[in-house]
Amino acid sequence: MLKKKSILIFTIIFFLNTPSLLANEKLKIIENINNIKTLKFNFVQISFDKKENGICFLKRPHFLKCIYEDKNKKELIVNRRNLVIYHKRYNKTYYYPVSKSYFIDILDKKKFENLILDGNLSLNEEIFKIKYSTENKGEIIFFFNKENFNLSGWEIIDLNGNHTSFKIDNLNKNQNLNNKLFSIPEIN
């Protein structure tokens, strides 16, 4: 009988403390994110059943460039308020509103912090997941390494129900990145 009471008390204490434990983990993630000025990483992206990979460079608060290893030599560039897909092979540039994407939220430390604080945190054996959704952008799930709190990827479900998975590997923090790297190519 005493053993059952002990287990019951432990279970109650554990579940009462779980929200504060998760809040503490969110703060550790935010602290890690706020210490990042630049990132360089390899990625694997899966969208529309197509797997793509490449390398990305991120410089806060305004810049992101992902270079895809594909035949079109595609580049995704976020440069302040512009979101551009550039096909180097064809010298074609396509502009999109960055306001309808989560990139602006990831690049801005305060906005990213708010996504983390307002999102629902869950964990498994290896990663923390933070799920956040909004009416005008859809849903995003961020993945963070459980050991070092590094961003390890995200999954987006857009307003049309399309899934995009983005996995990060070989993450390097706070390297010098020249702003020229994020220039939008001029069309000839």
Predicted regions and their residues:
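Bacterial N-terminal signal peptides that target proteins for export
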Residues: 1-8
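Bacterial N-terminal signal peptides
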Residues: 9-17
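Short hydrophobic/aromatic-rich beta-strand segments that constitute the beta-sheet cores
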Residues: 43, 64-68, 83-86, 130, ...
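An acidic-aromatic
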Residues: 56-105, 164
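Flexible, surface-exposed loop/linker segments and immediately adjacent secondary-structure boundaries
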Residues: 89-127
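Gly/Pro-enriched, hydrophobic low-complexity segments
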Residues: 114-188
